[in-house]
Design a protein with these regions (language model features):
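Core segments of cupin and vicinal oxygen chelate
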Residues: 11-62, 106
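A short, acidic/glycine-rich surface segment
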Residues: 39-44, 74-78, 145-147
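Short beta->alpha connector loops
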Residues: 49, 72-73, 96-97, 117-118
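Acetyl-CoA-dependent GNAT
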Residues: 69-75, 139-140
Length: 150
């Protein structure tokens, strides 16, 4: 039985810069940090040979985000657009979208434009982390699709 979403993994091109952004700008907490250098168990679990990577597990209010920077195999820059297949973005629910938008801009987050009010109870805006991964800020007041229990 599936009991919930545990984490979302995000590939980054500069581990230290990403870790600083996700902890200082977004307020996530580091709960685990590891380095892998051709570890047999990691190779088998991930399905790649000879991996060399850094990983950090970050705690959010109701799930985890995992940051990965691989140096082997050599990563490719496959930044997605919101319309591409795969995992094109993560959404962070916020309680004051304009305040978070303004605050994250001071941390260097680049947004596609200004906050959009989608309806009376929903607002959203897309931006990118320092590695170019898409992050949506989402303010929703409707209890049916608001944040799950913490």
């Amino acid at each position: 039985m599936i009991v919930g979403l545990h984490h979302v993994a995000i590939g980054v091109d500069n581990f230290d810069k990403a870790l600083t952004f996700y902890t200082e700008a977004l307020g996530f907490e580091v709960v685990q940090q590891s380095e892998f250098d051709n570890d047999a168990n990691a190779n088998q679990a991930i399905g790649l040979d000879g991996i060399k990577a850094k990983m950090a597990m970050l705690k959010t209010p109701n799930a985890f985000v995992e940051l990965w920077q691989y140096s082997q195999p050599a990563p490719q820059d496959l930044r997605s657009r919101p319309c591409d297949y795969g995992y094109p973005h993560i959404a962070l629910q916020v309680d004051d979208i304009q305040a978070e938008y303004d605050r994250l801009k001071t941390h260097g987050m680049e947004f596609v434009g200004e906050v959009v009010h989608l309806s009376d109870d929903a607002s959203a805006i897309y931006g990118r982390d320092p590695s170019g991964n898409i992050i949506e800020l989402y303010e929703i007041k409707s209890k049916e699709i608001a944040q799950l229990d913490r």
